[in-house]
Amino acid sequence: MIKKAIARVVEREDLSQSEMIQVMDQIMSGEATPAQIAAFITALRMKGETVAEIAGAARVMRDRATRIRVGKNVLDLDRDDINIDLETILDVVGTGGDGTNTFNISTTVSFVVAACGVKVAKHGNRSVSSACGSADVVEALGISLEVTPETVENCINEAGIGFLYAPALHGAMKFAIGPRKEIGIRTIFNILGPLTNPAGAPCQVLGVYREELVEKLAHVLKNLGCRRGFVVYGMDGMDEITLTTETRMAEVTPEEVKAWLFKPEDLGFARCTMDDLRGGDAVANAVTVRGILEGEKGPKRDVVLINAAFGLVAAGRAANPAEGVKLAVEALDSGAALAKLEKLKALTNA
């Protein structure tokens, strides 16, 4: 199948979702050769990936991931019988690769949202293009990545937050590692990670590194059964909701995708400069994250609040972003968000 798919994609023909599933099955089972994988993902990048192609690939990755159980059930985005009140779980994640070198905003947001009573399955990896990926800062904060899936499950169930280290839970990705490194360009795999949370998080805030991906990935999330989510791109290049300028956003519900341009002033926040949000290496960013959780004020705290607000809306904890900001402020000022960090640290090192 993959040889035929390469020939078609080279001619700029789109694949159906079922055809993409067949190709990805070959890639992730080890049937496709490294040369075939490299040729296919390069041709796909040159043609441009469609919603159906991305969704098909994401379904295969999800099916082959080590599943993380929350409560009594494995959450599955394909299920029609999800009780959203009992099983709401959120992921706040970016594609990475935006090149802005900010501190780890979505990781900080995860602790804040968890402190507001939302179960968080934070899916992440080491750095792609910055000095510090989410896994790097989590490790620098003293949270162990060398844990079993059962420990991750226990963290989410007991602490309300767990870190899902992508390489440990997506074993079938090993067949694509070599070709990806050797060709050295962005491919479909750069956007699949945030779409393939092993806990099946039905609520999501997803940051992307290109504006044209906002509505495309919003439609992918809808295709995959997302209950509610936001896809965001800061017009300064950030794969987060930014405070330096406007943010292109798309809200996802089972019924529709709605896009708009969000301004920080809409929620009463002052704009800042990119330098105000810059990060450093893992150790420096860990100091920043802990400082915010301990109550330090400033633009870094503000950008966490604004991103947490939309996470709380996505999870149904807040009726609107303004209410979300109030809840996030309380989570930080009360020490509840810091307590989530300490609890997760303790559970992963027990």
Curated annotation (Swiss-Prot):
Keyword Transferase included in the entry's annotation = yes
Q: Which GO terms describe its molecular function?
A: anthranilate phosphoribosyltransferase activity; magnesium ion binding
Disulfide bonding pattern of the chain = none
The record's Gene Ontology biological-process terms are: L-tryptophan biosynthetic process
* Cofactor(s) in the UniProt record: Mg(2+)
Q: Where does Mg(2+) 2 bind?
A: 239-240
- What is the E.C. number? 2.4.2.18
Cofactor: how bound = Binds 2 magnesium ions per monomer.
- Identify the pathway: Amino-acid biosynthesis; L-tryptophan biosynthesis; L-tryptophan from chorismate: step 2/5
Annotated keywords: Amino-acid biosynthesis, Aromatic amino acid biosynthesis, Glycosyltransferase, Magnesium, Metal-binding, Transferase, Tryptophan biosynthesis
- Per UniProt, anthranilate 1 binds at 94, 125
Per its record, the protein catalyses: N-(5-phospho-beta-D-ribosyl)anthranilate + diphosphate = 5-phospho-alpha-D-ribose 1-diphosphate + anthranilate
> Does the keyword Secreted feature in the UniProt annotation?
no
- Secretion signal, residue range per the UniProt entry: none
Residues given in the record as Mg(2+) 1 binding sites: 106, 240
Enumerate the residues binding 5-phospho-alpha-D-ribose 1-diphosphate. Answer: 94, 97-98, 102, 104-107, 122-130, 134
PANTHER family recorded for this chain?
ANTHRANILATE PHOSPHORIBOSYLTRANSFERASE (PTHR43285:SF2)
HAMAP family, alphabetized: TrpD
Name the protein family: Belongs to the anthranilate phosphoribosyltransferase family.
User: What name is this protein filed under?
Assistant: Anthranilate phosphoribosyltransferase
From which organism does this entry originate?
Geotalea daltonii (strain DSM 22248 / JCM 15807 / FRC-32)
